[in-house]
């Protein structure tokens, strides 16, 4: 990912914080700039873009000349205060893959799988992980307790990071007791309590009046507090269809009773980004005590706008986002963690007043693949951020640009999300590929051809694309073989991008 061209950087150390190490393959270490994470923080914009570009160029040159001296920047995690953030621009990432995500049809996980995913989520550096609904079964209760005792107590010695472990409960005392008893072993335990707040839910599910629901919520929060829980989140189920004035009242009572965070859920995914953002703004402006807690957003994807709604909530002032890996969840799923996090990383500084997270985005692909494997829910190839086609190009025009500079058609670096790629390893040859891409791939395979021979091969390549959707390296070698003599660059061929070197070839007829 490149820097936003209109913002300046404040660095504790001009050299050490200009880049971070990125593990690649073997002993190779790559360097790239990361913004706005770690000690790189965005401040005021430069008045002239040229000044910013000039500054970045000087930083880049220093990094290149001193690469062997650079060390990874380690930043201490700020003190965790349940109802406050150390920085008004910091956005907490609340992952609910192990609770809401597991509710996706067919996504049931075994206890060992849930524990492994929790460990991976800790590597990803999520702030909060909601790991289940303990009252649902004894197995669920014990699994949550195990995660609380293990993952919830593994403190990173260098950074001080340890995740908040949360369990969900209805506004029922036995639910709340089960939730607290399962998570209390964690260093940072949280109990999440939810209650329906829309008229349709209160009438048909709860069969209670608004006044009765408000009292139920307040007493539930007080009960959780009486158990010793100091981190209590209250969530409004179906807030997207709830009356705004009623939401202000019930949230205010929950805060008054001791809630440290409140969650406004578009449970059925009915809201559009503009109206969801307006809802968040309204609640933040009219709810008593709202500035004394952390405001959270939870969006479902029934109309395909969960990511957009979540971002709209952040723009409106929310500072906790509730997401799932790969967007799995009930019906059409939830806001995908990878999309929300990368949107904040890529555009948070530029159009969202400098908001950021502390997610280690290099763990995104590994986390996505683990969740796919364990749930059996595999993402489509063009799924943003983690799909197989995200960093792959077939169009000739695009391939030409990518071969010259990847940033021509990629706004994110593959390495940013844990995908190691070279300059042209995302090139896929097919009917839309142009001469530049084909010639470059042949050269990487070890073939240097004059224009006449290449023209012959390219013509045959075009014919082959009418029979096959994708042309492989083996296909290219066969095309060269059928076209007569060619000159190898190197006695044993060239090894590139993980491909097997081409064997030495003598003149072929």
Swiss-Prot record:
Its EC number is 2.3.3.17. Gene3D superfamilies: 1.10.238.260, Aldolase class I. Signal peptide: none annotated. Residues 1-55 form a transit peptide. One of its GO terms (cellular component) is chloroplast. One of its GO terms (biological process) is L-leucine biosynthetic process. Mn(2+) binds at residues 100, 298, 300. Inhibited by EDTA, Cu(2+) and Zn(2+). It holds the Pfam family HCS_D2. InterPro entries: 2-IPM_HCS-like, AIPM/Hcit_synth_CS, Aldolase_TIM, LeuA/HCS_post-cat, PYR_CT. Keywords: Chloroplast, Manganese, Metal-binding, Plastid, Transferase, Transit peptide. Its cofactor is Mn(2+); Co(2+). Its main location: plastid. Optimum pH is 8. It catalyses: 4-methylsulfanyl-2-oxobutanoate + acetyl-CoA + H2O = 2-(2-methylsulfanyl)ethylmalate + CoA + H(+). Strongly activated by Mn(2+) and Co(2+), and weakly activated by Fe(2+), Ni(2+), Mg(2+) and Ca(2+). Transmembrane segments: none annotated. The keyword Transferase applies. The N-terminal part of the protein controls substrate specificity. Determines the side chain length of aliphatic glucosinolate structures. Involved in the biosynthesis of glucosinolate derivative natural products such as 6-(methylsulfinyl)hexylisothiocyanate (6-MSITC), a compound found in wasabi with diverse health-promoting properties. Catalyzes the conversion of 4-methylsulfanyl-2-oxobutanoate (4-MTOB) into 2-(2-methylsulfanyl)ethylmalate (2-(2-MT)EM). Belongs to the alpha-IPM synthase/homocitrate synthase family. Monomer. This is Methylthioalkylmalate synthase 1-1, chloroplastic.
């Amino acid at each position: 990912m490149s820097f936003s061209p209109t913002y300046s950087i404040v660095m504790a150390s001009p050299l050490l914080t200009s880049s971070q190490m990125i593990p690649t393959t073997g002993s190779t270490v790559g360097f790239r700039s990361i913004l706005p994470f770690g000690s790189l923080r965005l401040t005021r914009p430069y008045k002239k873009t040229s000044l910013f570009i000039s500054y970045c160029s000087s930083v880049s040159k220093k990094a290149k000349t001193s690469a062997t001296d650079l060390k990874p920047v380690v930043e201490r995690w700020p003190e965790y205060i349940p109802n406050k953030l150390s920085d008004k621009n910091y956005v907490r990432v609340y992952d609910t893959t192990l609770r809401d995500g597991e509710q996706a049809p067919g996504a049931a996980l075994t206890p060992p799988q849930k524990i492994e995913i929790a460990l991976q989520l800790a590597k990803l550096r999520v702030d909060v992980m909601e790991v289940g609904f303990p009252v649902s079964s004894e197995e669920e209760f014990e699994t949550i307790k195990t995660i609380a005792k293990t993952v919830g107590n593994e403190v990173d010695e260098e950074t001080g990071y340890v995740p908040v472990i949360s369990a969900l409960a209805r506004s029922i005392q036995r639910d709340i007791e089960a939730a607290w008893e399962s998570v209390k072993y964690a260093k940072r335990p949280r109990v999440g309590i939810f209650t329906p707040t829309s008229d349709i839910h209160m009438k048909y599910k709860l069969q209670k009046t608004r006044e009765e629901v408000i009292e139920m919520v307040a007493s539930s929060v007080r009960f959780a507090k009486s158990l010793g829980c100091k981190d209590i989140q209250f969530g409004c189920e179906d807030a997207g269809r709830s009356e705004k004035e009623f939401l202000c009242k019930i949230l205010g009572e929950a805060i008054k009773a001791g809630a440290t965070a409140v969650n406004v859920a578009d449970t059925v995914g009915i809201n559009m980004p503009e109206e969801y953002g307006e809802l968040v703004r309204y609640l933040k402006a009219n709810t008593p005590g709202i500035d004394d807690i952390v405001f959270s957003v939870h969006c479902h994807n029934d109309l395909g706008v969960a990511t957009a709604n979540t971002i709209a909530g952040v723009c409106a002032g929310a500072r906790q986002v509730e997401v799932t890996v790969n967007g799995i969840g009930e019906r059409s799923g939830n806001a995908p963690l990878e999309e929300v996090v990368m949107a904040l990383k890529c555009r948070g500084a530029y159009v969202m007043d400098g908001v950021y997270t502390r997610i280690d985005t290099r763990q995104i692909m590994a986390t996505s693949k683990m969740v796919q494997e364990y749930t059996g829910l595999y993402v489509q190839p063009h799924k943003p951020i983690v799909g197989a086609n995200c960093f792959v190009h077939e169009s000739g025009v695009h391939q030409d640009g990518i071969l010259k500079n990847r940033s021509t058609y990629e706004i994110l670096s593959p390495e940013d999300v844990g995908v190691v790629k070279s300059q042209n390893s995302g090139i896929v040859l097919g009917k839309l590929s142009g001469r530049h891409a084909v010639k470059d791939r042949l050269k990487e395979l070890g073939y240097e051809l004059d224009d006449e021979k290449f023209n012959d091969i390219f013509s045959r390549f075009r014919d082959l694309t009418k029979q096959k959707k994708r042309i492989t390296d083996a296909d290219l070698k066969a095309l060269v073989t059928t076209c007569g003599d060619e000159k190898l660059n190197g006695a044993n061929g060239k090894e590139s991008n993980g491909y097997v070197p081409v064997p030495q070839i003598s003149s072929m007829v």
